[in-house]
Amino acid sequence: MRRPSRAALVQALLARQQASARALEAAGAPAQPKAIEARLILLGERVAEAFHRRAMEALGPIIKRAMEREQGKRADAIDELAPEGSAIDRAMRSLESQAASVTIGVASAVDAASRDLDSWNAEEIARQISIPVDSVAPDPEALNEFRNSAVGLIKDISAEQHRRIKELVDEAQTTGMRVETLAKRLEDELGIAKRRARLIGRDQVLKANAKLTQDRMQAAGFKRYRWSSGTDARVRPMHRELDGQVFSWDDPPVTNP
């Protein structure tokens, strides 16, 4: 009787991981990577909400005064923000320092998430290839890469909010944008930042889990793997086309971002 190839074993491993995840979800308990993804998304969204709240506290009174002056004037009336120039400058300088202060605690939260992801991945790999979990070595390089990348990206959420809000306020002052329009666009900035937080959480956990799996499978002697794509709408067309194909860990396919 022929022994299954290593590629076939990897395919079976991935299939069992997916089945295990589906079973956990069906039972009402999210698979660990999904739970960790949700934690990072929530962390990023809280950073976005905290900075947005401070931005509205700083700029809200200025916008309110300008809107009161704007009421009853022609739709093309301009320069209602002009008298607020000094107040706007003070507000933006204050917000620049607050962009960093709202990210206090991000590093420790990401560190905890990375440890949980590493533990889950080690136990899952050990279970699927039937080896003691103690023999699955930790992967400090992959974890450090995950921590540094995730912390940097989540901290940049508020910094990017500050940049975008400053550009928006500068545009309003330069072009004579209606204050009502400025207020609406400032509110929209929170949604933009939260969408970025969701993208960061999903992308970082996906990459980290894939890297941990690759390193541990290679350490166990597996030289090739079978590409297995997800089934949801987020799967890129190129990745869907690769589903089921076998590749070497040392020579992965070139995919479009």
Language model features: what each stretch is:
Residues 1-189:
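N-terminal leader/targeting and assembly helices and adjacent pre-domain segments
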Residues 192-257:
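Acidic, glycine-rich two-metal-ion catalytic cores of nucleic acid-processing enzymes
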